[in-house]
């Protein structure tokens, strides 16, 4: 589109379009024309590709045909949902003038901008997931990061000190839209994300940010929020708030404060740990078989979102954890009575956000009324519970009898979707509205009587009175009887099998009906806006109630999970260490067809590191992950899958397990593994829980072994972290002889001929064999390949037994001689745990070619 400069050469309507488009050059403009939203020029081309809609041409303007695409106004939400999922933003431009009185084009203006991070419409949002808008800032002192959930008003800021912490924050919050300054240097950190928005530098000005935030919260300064000195975070928050005001074009009364999130308040997890533990997303990007999938049976969407926030930010505040544990304990006998009432409360949090933005639909108000009707039952059910924390939450749930009464009087039982459809305000609420409705209804009755009268008077049995949007009211007579109509019948429309007529009397009543309907609808819209004015003064109390109800839902849900899944209440101790009796993996035990074998775990200052050996598929990774998940669950206040657990102070959880090539960044598996390892060695403390699985496997035998040895030594002697160290390097099993606090444990298996039975039970001491060939046989590797491998194994073991030194078991073919076969090096570097059956088979053929 080259013609924006020469506006005069365009038609008046296109001039209007181009002026509006110039104000929103970067985003799609949906331009309302009658029953359609139209897009023109490049917008039309882009939308036709993204939405798979027809690209046509509309006449010509400035001598050029105009590319055009359009969507019907009644289906616009579906198209917006698709665009938002693709990370696009859309400006909605409506007709605000009256076509009947307009000279020239009807007046239009952009009434809202829909962006991925600022949506509140039910149709566009994922119900059980937070939808965050975020802004990021970086300077020499570090990062500033702000997030806002506009559908709840939750506004958070943080100041990650380094790029690893910033990456972990992005992974945790997973914003739908991210604002960044045009000078942002670390593009590699964000460039893979959807919904990126480059913003001018002035939007991040610290003074402007302070003014914006103080104005929003009605405060003099930000000291009360604890963010006055958070200079980087405030820059991000200021840009974010400005963007929301620009896109929403209305006040934001539900955003009432800002909270600083400090890493030290919770258990810190880096991006790799969050991914590996599969908290809310599995390694394939789906949501099945995750911790959230097992733990989340919340009956409200707002409760589900709160639980996921807890999982991603476990707290270290012992008082909070004890409160939650006691509440869960006291709700175990009540959850079955409480959950049905909570389910009826629905997603009050998001309804209130739409109320605050004055975009609530009639059905939102009906749902709010329904939520208010549940509150007396919830109060009655919980008032006898003696746990102080449950009473504290209950005291935050208000009783809104007046508002309930207002909505019961004002809104019909089952309102239509939109106010413009009419019929939202209940009869008897407003006398003027009732009068106009009676007029409209009376006129309708009159038309029924007119039809009967004319049919009988003229003796035309096919005569009927009808209405359509183009021609208004008409009298229809079949073609066969049309020659019998009297002369004062004026033909209005001819159809294939009928003729339509108008008579003066009908025209008069048409005007009366349309006038009374239009008047009734105008009054109804005014009364609907008035309802917002009556509800909004109570917004603060309503939001507090919604938050308390969401938390009661999470706690009742965790009480149900604890009872159903046989979880025990962990003891949160201030003594260092982790002791678990009969621990189980919360996800694996639910997907296994056979009973899960529970296992103990003991870590203490005298027993800091477990060297874990045993066969592939023996359960090493499961054992390690279940430990991390039990510790994490204990730190959200939940009961845990064990018969007993005592959890001491934990500041961070690190996992270095099963890396894959990071093709996007051009990093090999080994490079990914070493980067994660470096992060652990730099940041772990004696209170950290560290899971190290098969360190050093992506390089040659000696490199890998030396790295694994040095890492284990460093973690055990310098850092003194609580470490689970799984390895196939059996040389590492000699570490306990050389260092205090290091202990061998193994997972056992029984071999019989070519078959193997994994015991999945953890025993003290080192494993005696790796059982790699038995696992290959299980994976379906052909018998002749297994046979040849056994033969080769015996040869290699013979070589190994001549050259082996120290206490290394000859059967482990550690091959300390210099003349190592490439096949053996490849075998050593291979991690069978991470192979699919097909990959295992490919490797066997590759190894055969090497030998």
From Swiss-Prot:
Q: Which UniProt keywords apply?
A: ATP-binding, DNA damage, DNA repair, DNA-binding, Nucleotide-binding
Query: One matching Pfam family, short form?
Result: MutS_II
> Its domain of life?
Bacteria
Q: Name one GO cellular component term.
A: cytosol
Q: Could you tell me which InterPro entries the record lists for this protein?
A: DNA_mismatch_repair_MutS, DNA_mismatch_repair_MutS-lik_N, DNA_mismatch_repair_MutS/MSH, DNA_mismatch_repair_MutS_C, DNA_mismatch_repair_MutS_clamp, DNA_mismatch_repair_MutS_core, DNA_mismatch_repair_MutS_N, DNA_mismatch_repair_MutS_sf
Molecular function (GO) terms for this protein are: ATP binding; ATP-dependent DNA damage sensor activity; damaged DNA binding; mismatched DNA binding
Q: Which residues bind ATP?
A: 614-621
Q: Name one GO biological process term.
A: mismatch repair
Q: Give the stretches traversing the membrane.
A: none
CDD domains attached here? Answer: ABC_MutS1
Sum up the protein's function in the record's words: This protein is involved in the repair of mismatches in DNA. It is possible that it carries out the mismatch recognition step. This protein has a weak ATPase activity.
**HAMAP family registered for this protein in UniProt:** MutS (MF_00096)
Q: Which family does it belong to?
A: Belongs to the DNA mismatch repair MutS family.
The protein, known as: DNA mismatch repair protein MutS
Q: Which organism is it from?
A: Serratia proteamaculans (strain 568)
Q: Which gene encodes it?
A: mutS
